Structure formats: structure tokens, C-alpha cells
UniProtKB/Swiss-Prot annotation:
Pfam families: DUF520 (PF04461)
Stated family: Belongs to the YajQ family.
InterPro entries tied to this protein: DUF520 (IPR007551), UPF0234-like_C (IPR035571), UPF0234_N (IPR035570), YajQ-like_sf (IPR036183)
Entry superkingdom: Bacteria
GO cellular component: cytosol
This protein's name: Nucleotide-binding protein MXAN_1478
Matches recorded under HAMAP family: YajQ
Single Gene Ontology MF annotation: nucleotide binding
Keywords from the named record: Nucleotide-binding
Organism field: Myxococcus xanthus (strain DK1622)
PANTHER family, sorted: UPF0234 PROTEIN YAJQ
Protein's job: Nucleotide-binding protein.
Gene3D superfamilies per record: 3.30.70.860, YajQ-like, domain 2
Length: 165
């Protein structure tokens, strides 16, 4: 029976490159001189911390980071923004969590979307991914088209892998 998997993964090499490019740009741009602006990727690749000496500099550094991520084809749907918080007398930071895998509640939404569309496919939740099976290839391609159409509404980064006939 034909099937494919829906996953949400970030290319960690591209993520590291984007963070390094952001660091380089922050160190060379004139408007960031003396602001102690920095972008740090957590050692376990689960979060990015943006630091500076004021909220508007954190926002500006975050915009630079988002631009670099978008240029490297990393979906911005895979980011969860934390609150901007003070870390000392003159420092501010924001933690951006990286979403790897599809959360269970989003998987349930995707399965419900398949059932509501009345397509002849079934979705099964497997840990942090979703497997979609159907009787023929055309149904699976229609399911992929449906997921791509609803991707903005669901605010979920999705890739389709392991397409088997």
C-alpha cells in the first residue's frame, strides 16, 4: 500500500550557518556597535538566544537572524518566540525555541483534516511524525496538496518523505 511520512525537521548545518552569518553581520554593522548584541545557538540545538542591551536592539538582531534563516530555506514556522526578558542591569534577551518533530496535537489536527476532506487515505501518528497511507498514488498526492494548502493556517513546518509506492 502506498504511503508517505509527514515530518518537521530543521537542517542543523544550515541553522548553524545562519546563526554564524548573523553573528558576523552583528559584529560588523555600525548600528550594532557597542550594543553587545549576540546570537547564541544552544549546544543541543533546541533554542537560539538573542541578546543585546535594549529591547529594540534585540528586535533588530532577531530580524537579521530571521532574514538569514529565510535565505537558507529554514521555515520560520519552526520557531517559537519566548518573551523578551531582562538579564541584568542593562541587558535583555529573547529565547527562540526550535521545533523538531510534529507535536501530537498538530498531528491530530492533520488526521482530522484528512478525515474531513473525505479522501481515501488514513493518517497514523508515529511519535513525532505522521504516516499517511492510501490505495493509490493520486490520493496521496492530493493529501500532500491539501497539507501544503493548509500549512499557513496550521503554522507548521512540514516536509514529506519516504514516498513509497
Amino acid at each position: 500500500m502506498p504511503s508517505f511520512d509527514v515530518v518537521s525537521k530543521i537542517d542543523l548545518a544550515e541553522l548553524d550557518n545562519a546563526v554564524n552569518q548573523t553573528k558576523k553581520e552583528l559584529s560588523t554593522r555600525y548600528d550594532f556597535q557597542g550594543t553587545h548584541a549576540d546570537v547564541v545557538l544552544a549546544p543541543d540545538n533546541t533554542a537560539i538566544t538573542v541578546k543585546a542591551n535594549s529591547e529594540d536592539r534585540v528586535q533588530a538582531a532577531k530580524e537579521v537572524l530571521l532574514t538569514k534563516l529565510a535565505k537558507r530555506n529554514i521555515s520560520l514556522f519552526a520557531l517559537e518566540y519566548g518573551d523578551i526578558e531582562k538579564t541584568g542591569l542593562h541587558n535583555v534577551k529573547q529565547v527562540i525555541k526550535l521545533q523538531q518533530g510534529i507535536p501530537v496535537e498538530k498531528s491530530k489536527e492533520l488526521v482530522k483534516l484528512l478525515k474531513d476532506s473525505k479522501m481515501k487515505v488514513q493518517g497514523s501518528i508515529q511519535a513525532d511524525q505522521l504516516r499517511v497511507t492510501g490505495k493509490n498514488r493520486d490520493d496521496l498526492q492530493a493529501a500532500i496538496a491539501l497539507f501544503r494548502k493548509e500549512q499557513d493556517r496550521l503554522k507548521l513546518d512540514m516536509q514529506f518523505i519516504n514516498f513509497r509506492d
